């Protein structure tokens, strides 16, 4: 069976819902517009579902008119895709920092009303040089891509009383036609003209326990994953982080050619 790219997801706002797309271009940061926006508190710290599970209920869409955000009980928010020239604010994400452009005041008000505390929506400028590793990244934790196979999720769901959907793990690229956890053995993959280097396994956190449709928290699937996916340092590993070596356009259905480790 040929390995193929079975799904592409873009997450414009960090920790908000993603967008499933059939075809999407890459830029210097990774998938175009992926995690180019983030919500920060009054001290500049990036907010995520880890603290605010309700961020999962924010639906995103990208079109000719810009970025659209919707959430239960909230008016629709429309924002331009381009940098609007807002003032720069310092942003802290994990152990590194950068500057980002403040979005419109109405965006701050929208998010503050949703989360119940004063916060700002910021956009990473095109010229930003956030480099938690060897490459520029947007507001992703550390790497531009998360790669996961359908078979890995199937293997997990076979152990769960209640199966979970793929969106619990928020991958960018989903691969079909491979064995469970085959991605653990890859040094890289080629998808059409795009080459990606597999960098390290993704250590999973409590965000996997948040139902992305309801924002309800539970103990699964992290509890079950911990019984068979512990890494050497104790982390619970599921999926692989990756960075792109070349640019191009990815399409669902593209053949995925793995490069084995070693």
Language-model features, listed with the residues they occupy:
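Metal-cofactor-dependent catalytic cores
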Residues: 1-262
């Amino acid at each position: 069976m040929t390995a193929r790219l079975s799904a592409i997801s873009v997450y414009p706002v960090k920790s908000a819902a993603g967008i499933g797309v059939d075809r999407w271009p890459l830029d210097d940061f990774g998938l175009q517009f992926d995690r180019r926006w983030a919500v920060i508190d009054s001290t500049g710290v990036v907010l995520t579902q880890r603290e605010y599970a309700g961020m999962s209920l924010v639906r995103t869409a990208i079109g000719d008119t810009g970025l659209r955000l919707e959430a239960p009980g909230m008016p629709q928010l429309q924002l331009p895709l381009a940098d609007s020239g807002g003032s720069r604010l310092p942003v802290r994400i994990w152990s590194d920092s950068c500057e980002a452009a403040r979005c419109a005041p109405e965006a701050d008000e929208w998010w503050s009303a949703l989360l119940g505390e004063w916060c700002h929506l910021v956009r990473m400028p095109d010229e930003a040089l956030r480099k938690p590793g060897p490459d520029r990244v947007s507001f992703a934790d550390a790497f531009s891509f998360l790669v996961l196979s359908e078979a890995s999720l199937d293997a997990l769901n076979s152990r769960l009383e209640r199966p979970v959907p793929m969106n619990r793990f928020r991958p960018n690229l989903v691969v079909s036609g491979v064995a469970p956890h085959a991605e653990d053995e890859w040094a890289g993959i080629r998808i059409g003209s795009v080459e990606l280097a597999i960098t390290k396994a993704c250590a999973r956190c409590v965000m996997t326990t948040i139902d992305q449709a309801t924002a309800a928290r539970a103990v699964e699937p992290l509890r079950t994953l911990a019984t068979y996916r512990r890494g050497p340092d104790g982390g619970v590993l599921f999926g692989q982080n990756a960075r792109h070596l070349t640019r191009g356009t990815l399409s669902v259905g593209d053949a995925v050619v793995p490069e084995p480790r070693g």
